[in-house]
Amino acid sequence: MIIQLRLIAKKGFIVPLHYKSLLQGYLYHHFPQDMGSFLHDEGFQSGSRTFKHFVFSDLQEKARKVGSFLHFDKEITFFVSSPVPEILEGLGEEILRNPGNLGHNLISEALVSQATPDLLAREVAVVMISPLVVYRTLVQEDGRKYTDFLTPHHPDFPTLVKNNLLRKYESLFGDVPTNLSFSIEPLGPFEVRGQYFRNFYLKGTYGRFLLKGDPRLLSLALTTGLGSKNAQGFGMAVHAP
């Protein structure tokens, strides 16, 4: 399930250059209390990994950069997706009832629309509307750990994306069938950008990708997100035009 959120502020919007944590905070503030507490404190388990099973996009409108802030006109739009309909149903209802504030921006009106992706094919072309983050933790010779962010040309990139998706499947449905196939490859040029989520620096990829495999995994990829840090606003993919 995917919902589109359109927020309107009479004076326009001013948000930080790295605004992902602001959007995440807005969503958590509008989740119904029980759902928000569950997602924040527990989530969905796969071994030692925990998944929130929602993802959100970048803001879709163009902005003017002024110092360390972005200035938007009176309306901003972003998308939120989840394979668990209950997560988004309560969210949309609460935002319509009480749009509230986005940071210091008073929201005068909110519009919510929804769609359920119909995906039965075994391959689909997608475009990232928030950056795809793929990383692994390595250890240096002195024993210190560091984060290695992978680009689509790295040979381990497809494997890490697939393994992450299989763990997400397991956290939702239990056992993972042995015949679940999945592959990902870039379609044309892509762009790697760095940005912060709070004090954490992340690198992610924008571009188009071809996903192939079991429709159950392809559907999950489009609703829960690809790669890591989905609940922080990374890895949302939609059908490519």
What kind of feature is each model-predicted range?
Residues 1-241:
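RNA-interacting cores
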